[in-house]
Amino acid sequence: MSPDALLVSAQRAGWQPPDSLTAVLLPAAQARPVYRALDPGTLVLDDLPDATGVLLVPDADRSHLLRQLSGRTAVVGPARPWTHASASYARAVRARLLSPDIRDTEGHLPELVLSADADAFADLRARALAPLRALPAATAGRLEGTLRAWLLHQGRRDEVAAALFVHPQTVRYRMAQLRELFPDLASPDRVLELTLAVGLRPS
């Protein structure tokens, strides 16, 4: 249905559409109690077959909404134009599948992007980290962790050491190993590929 057709339907129903809607997923039993504390224009779905409740909150002040949901098992999607509220709902669903600990999807965009195509991500990891495959699993794991910290801390050895709880000399030794395994480690294309490959820890 086109946005114009949706608007006509909303007007016929006597509903004034907001500029945006934010989807909130939470247990169905919590939907009504939370709804009573929110904007009265909030739409409630609490009769879905999987016992999930959905709130569609109009023009939400995100920080206020998150405070209102404190202590609740809730996932908050992004604000979207009301005609695209399904996109907010879809992201909240994906976030909940990714981790039960996610509350605000806006705080987990890198994980959501990297997990959007699990098959492509697995292929990327396999290709990018192929030089580690010949090593014992424990060694490969240590080197991958070091590589991840080195990339995320932009090669600052003391910060890498602090992140890994090791001595800076240990980082120096491991990075020497990694440079042998990845001779093109200074290549921007290689850095991008490796950063993506190690950016999300595999489940």
What residue spans do the PLM features occupy?
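Cytosolic nucleotide-utilizing catalytic cores of signal-transduction proteins
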Residues: S2-S203
